[in-house]
From Swiss-Prot:
Organism ancestry: Bacteria, Pseudomonadati, Pseudomonadota, Betaproteobacteria, Burkholderiales
Family of this protein: Belongs to the azoreductase type 1 family.
Quaternary structure note: Homodimer.
Alphabetical UniProt keywords: Flavoprotein, FMN, NAD, Oxidoreductase
Cofactor info, note text: Binds 1 FMN per subunit.
Keyword flag Flavoprotein: yes
Any Pfam family matching the protein: Flavodoxin_2
Keyword Flavoprotein: yes
Signal peptide: none
The protein, known as: FMN-dependent NADH:quinone oxidoreductase
HAMAP family, alphabetized: Azoreductase_type1
EC number: 1.6.5.-, 1.7.1.17
Cofactor: FMN
MF terms in GO: electron transfer activity; FMN binding; oxidoreductase activity, acting on NAD(P)H as acceptor; oxidoreductase activity, acting on NAD(P)H, quinone or similar compound as acceptor
Amino acid sequence: MTTILQINSAARSQGAQSTLLANELTAKLQQSNAGAKVVVRDLLADGLPHLDESVLGAFFTPADQRSAEQNAIVAKSDALIAELQAADIIVIGAPMYNFGVSSQLKTYFDWIARAGVTFRYTENGPEGLIKGKKVYVVTARGGKYLGTPNDSHTPYLRTFLGFIGLTDVSFIHAEGLNLGPDSQSAALASAREAIAAA
């Protein structure tokens, strides 16, 4: 059975365009993969703690020396990574905030980026360990940045995902959402056209 993991990272629980479009894409992919199981990871609802001394300490303490608190932190990270590993298709709703990803998504990345677990260092450089998955990233942006030096959003996402082994990545952009009704309509129509073709 195909498993689709949808990761919502908007800072709004209702009405976020990245989430709405990610929902549409997941529904389309579910139709294309009969019997597919859908798992939704809502990062806003999860409220993962930002990377701090306690989280880093847990990740870098040998398993046989961890405290109960550290074991709980690592167990949460392990569960997030297992969820990612179990997915065949990953859909990420990733709005652009101030030229980057949401703090929720950055925190999620910090919780799943673990040396020896999701990547490793070799004599030839780093190697991602989460492989063989298709990733769709649905972005929502108030302005238009694609193809300009101000688009630090797309390369960051591609770089991080590639670092942990996720190299088959397709982007669906909805840009210009805050540039007036006509621009918003055109942006959503373009995104939905890409969703239909996915």
